Amino acid sequence: MNLFFFQNCISPHQIPFIEELSVFTDVDRVVVIAPRVDYDDRKLMGWKASNLLKVSNVEFIIASSVDQVKKLYESCKGEDTYCFFSGINAFAEVVSWMKLSLNYPFKRGVITEPPLLYHYPLWQHSLRFALKDWKYVKHFNYLLVMGDEFVNYYRFWSKRWKVLPFIYCTEWKERTLPVPITEKLKVLYVGSFSDRKNVVA
């Protein structure tokens, strides 16, 4: 079995679980495909995605052309292959690789964030989905959505695909921190204050 993961960049929130997939006996090949390793703004936030390229038993293709991905697809003709696409609506490269995959008898999945409702109500997301995405649903076997709140929303659109709640993950490293001796409450927020995060100050 081949497992291919298409992303806009190498993600520290996905590589830890992707690396673990290679230990299963029926998995022959795990490949991560992205047009770039990282973005400059994410490097400034502390991302060190280039270090993730060193994980064992995972191939990385930093693809600058559709031909590179086509060559990968061609190498798997007749093999049990699963393609998982992240950012399918947001990144042109991922969209083109998804469309190219439709020429092959692969099984497909989407890894997606749920609809973000702080800018647009759900009915507008539904309208966009019906107009833009519905035509592709028949080509997908799985949809992995972050959290469980919108599992039923995606199940509504099709009985064909299996919808599963999903989470991002990071590599676990054991840490020992001294317990502060103080009566003051201290709160540490780790994250960005971008509108997309919907942090209410």
Predicted regions and their residues:
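Conserved donor-binding/catalytic core segment of Leloir-type glycosyltransferases
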Residues: 180-197
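Helix-loop-beta element that forms the nucleotide-linked donor phosphate-binding surface
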Residues: 151-170, 177-180
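A short, histidine- and acid-enriched strand-loop-helix "catalytic/donor-clamping" loop
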Residues: 108-126, 139-142, 172
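N-terminal strand-loop element at the rim of the active site
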Residues: 8-12, 24-64, 77
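An aromatic- and histidine-rich active-site surface loop
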Residues: 12-15, 82-106, 110-112
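Membrane-proximal helix-turn-helix segments that form the acceptor-binding/catalytic region
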Residues: 102-103, 125-143, 156
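Short hydrophobic "strand-cap" motifs at the C-terminus of beta-strands
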Residues: 6, 146, 189-193
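A conserved mid-protein helix/loop that constitutes part of the nucleotide-sugar donor-binding site
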Residues: 12-19, 194-201
